Every structure is written in C-alpha cells, then in structure tokens.
Amino acid sequence: MRCPYCGGLDTQVKDSRPSEDASAIRRRRICPDCGGRFTTFERVQLRELTVVKRSGRKVPFDRDKLQRSIDVALRKRSVESDRIERLVSGITRQLESSGEPEVTSEAIGELVMEGLKGLDDVAYVRFASVYKNFREAKDFEELLGRLSADQQDGAVPQAEADRPIGAGPPSEAAQPAAGEGGDAPMRRARSRA
C-alpha cells in the first residue's frame, strides 16, 4: 500500500481488526520511510457497479462519494458514526446484490433519502433539497408537510434507523410497544450506551 504522505511503497500493517459491523477490516499502517501512520479499510466488493447520471454519462460507483454525500447532509447533527457506516454499507450491499451492473443516480438518491428519513429528519430535508433541486420555499413546505404526515401515520418508525437499508422487515422487538412513542427504542438504546 502506497504511503499517502511520502509515496513510499513499503508500508507495514501494525494492527488489523474487523470494523464494528464486521463489514470491513480496519488496518493501521506505518511507513518506515517517513514514519507516517494511516488507516485503510478492506471491504468485500460483490460486483463492479456503474452509475448512470441524469445526463446519461456513466461513471464507476464510488462508495466514498456516497459516504461524503451522507456526511454533508449529517454535518453538525448528533448521529453516531457507526449508524452512518451501517447506512452506507446497507445501501452499497443493496445496490451490489440487485443483480444489475448499472444503477441510476436517481435510484441511489432515493435509497439515501429513505435511509436518512429514518435516521435524522434535518439531514433528510437537507439531502432532499439538493437532490430534488428545490428552488422555492414552497418546495420545503411540501416536503415538511409530507414528513409530518408520515410521522403522524407512523410510516417511518425511528427504530428502523438502526436497521440497514435492504435488511428486510424489522423484527417485532424493534417495534415500539403499545403506548410507546416512535422514539422509545432510541431512548432505550441511549440509556444502554
């Protein structure tokens, strides 16, 4: 692995361990030439995906770009990094296991919106405003109206935020008990932490 600091080719692995969700191997490396330390991640890649942009242009799928987009939407929000990683990994797994070699940027955007909607309302609105190219205040009003209606209908239980995209229906244990609000599982999870 090339050193990102000096370009040296002979870096050494000092520590290897699985990531928290076991979807990657985290390796701490050191460069004997400059002494630089850095971290790399090794992940399974099921297939090469191509993203078809709105313009028709085709580019390779970039997991890091997906991560950055989600990070921008979640900037200054109190969402744990492992939940963000589960969201990114879940979207990536769903795309790779779809069986299709090409995926539209619109499909990726919809998956991100679905994931953010269950994770953080503010991040969902931020992402949607850019993704849907909002031009006027009424665009925000319509989205917020739908979001409020969905929450009143219980369409997006907060407990689903911990479930990766594409993981199937939530178990009964993840559903709020009778009389509990949709955020009760989150309160229980925080009290355990």
From Swiss-Prot:
Residues 49-139 form the ATP-cone domain. Binds 1 zinc ion. Its cofactor is Zn(2+). A zinc finger (unnamed) spans 3-34. It holds the Pfam family Zn_ribbon_NrdR. Residues 150-193 are annotated as: Disordered. Keywords: ATP-binding, DNA-binding, Metal-binding, Nucleotide-binding, Repressor, Transcription, Transcription regulation, Zinc, Zinc-finger. Belongs to the NrdR family. PANTHER family: TRANSCRIPTIONAL REPRESSOR NRDR. Negatively regulates transcription of bacterial ribonucleotide reductase nrd genes and operons by binding to NrdR-boxes. NCBIfam families: transcriptional regulator NrdR (TIGR00244). This is Transcriptional repressor NrdR. It comes from Methylobacterium nodulans (strain LMG 21967 / CNCM I-2342 / ORS 2060). The gene is nrdR.
